[in-house]
A protein has these predicted regions:
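Structural preference for solvent-exposed beta-strand-turn elements
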Residues: 1-372
Length: 372
């Protein structure tokens, strides 16, 4: 088995696939890339059993063969090469020899047959959307997903497809984000929960991408195919909570304010808040928003006044500043609106501008009880 490939082209593809490989694997074979050569097409795969990702590369060869190559060793070697052709030759003594312009490097390989086979999706449904739209949907939601192993359904992002729109939801019970696109639809209704790891990989690869992504899915797995790459992952098993039920419908009190001004004020005041609750207080009266925090244990306190536009009754409401900061950071609008009903009901944060046609973002943040 022998092939010739550009060093930088191979490195670029392997760095993408390397994100799948865990630092410590129970199965040693998973520390490898699977190289499957079929004449001038080399398919490289990486897996952690839950997620498998593979790319098809163009190489110069007229051989066939399958080997598993140590991922970390190969990546470290490739990073040091300037652009040049590399020749890979599989020797009889169980090593693969790489020849560059200046030297030869031999590394031991494992039998490719030991590498776990990727799942074939049985009777999948499919939906196609632009890579950048998927990357944005992941970016806007994934930060709100939980980390609680006891509630695995909340540790992923809920994909909800219909013939009218595509909706992506994430929540950890303290905050919730719903991102909706009405400019993209599916041929039939479907819903599934995607784990964080494959989504993080997809987000990194697809940001700014103009190519289409085909999403195929059934009850247990999902497959994302784009350009020369495909990613297959196991879905999170379980039923997603009824998130619509927690979004308050009647919110008579509406605050509108410049996002950056609100964000920097919350960040500053939060420095003086209690280190366990991170509680800040919003007090709104007329066109004035008063943001304050106090850490009674250390006699630290801070207060800022901002002008805002507000319709509704004067009110005071407490929030965890970390959640509020995360959400404001994740929006890119100039102005935001915060809709509230009562101090013990969730606040709804939405961007006022800066959205594409057909793009809708709703963020929900649970209040914290104010100690008077």
């Amino acid at each position: 088995m022998k092939f010739i490939v550009s060093s930088t082209y191979l490195l670029k593809q392997l760095q993408v696939l390397g994100g799948v490989i865990n630092n410590s694997n129970t199965l040693p074979i998973l520390d490898n890339f699977l190289f499957d050569l079929d004449n001038n097409k080399l398919t490289v795969s990486a897996s952690d059993l839950e997620t498998t990702m593979s790319s098809v590369l163009d190489v110069d060869s007229d051989n066939e063969g399958t080997i598993a190559v140590p991922a970390r060793l190969l990546l470290e070697t490739l990073k040091t090469f300037p652009e040049q052709p590399l020749t890979f030759v599989v020797e009889d003594n169980n090593t693969v020899e790489i020849s560059s312009n200046h030297g030869k490097y031999a590394l031991a390989y494992a039998d490719g047959a030991e590498f776990p086979k990727a799942v074939e999706l049985a009777n999948p449904s499919s939906t196609t959307l632009l890579g950048d739209i998927l990357a944005t949907a992941i970016d806007k939601t994934i930060f709100a997903a939980g980390n609680d192993d006891l509630r695995p359904v909340m540790s992923g992002v809920f994909f909800q497809f219909s013939t009218e729109n595509l909706t992506f939801v994430a929540t950890d019970a303290h905050k919730l984000v719903k991102y909706q696109r009405t400019d993209v639809t599916a041929s039939q209704v479907a819903e599934f929960i995607m784990p964080k790891k494959p989504l993080t990989l997809l987000k990194g690869i697809l940001a700014g991408s103009e190519s289409d992504v085909v999403i195929e899915y059934n009850d247990s797995n999902a497959k994302f195919s784009f350009e020369n790459t495909e990613l297959i992952c196991r879905l999170i098993d379980g039923k997603y909570p009824n998130y619509e039920a927690v979004i308050p419908k009647e919110n008579p009190n509406v605050l509108s304010i410049a996002r950056n001004q609100f964000l920097s004020s919350v960040k500053r005041v939060a420095i003086f808040s209690n280190k366990t609750t991170h509680q800040i207080r919003l007090k709104i009266a007329g066109a004035e928003l008063n943001i304050s925090a106090e850490d009674i244990d250390y006699s630290n306190k801070a207060e800022e006044r901002l002008t805002c536009s507000y319709q509704g009754d004067d009110m005071q409401i407490g929030f965890n500043s970390r959640f509020l900061t995360e959400m404001l950071n994740n929006l890119n609008s100039d102005d935001v609106s915060l809709e509230m009903s009562l101090p013990n009901r969730a606040g709804i944060l939405t961007p006022i501008d800066g959205l594409d046609e057909g793009e809708h973002v709703t963020m929900l943040v649970m209040p914290v009880m104010l100690n008077s």
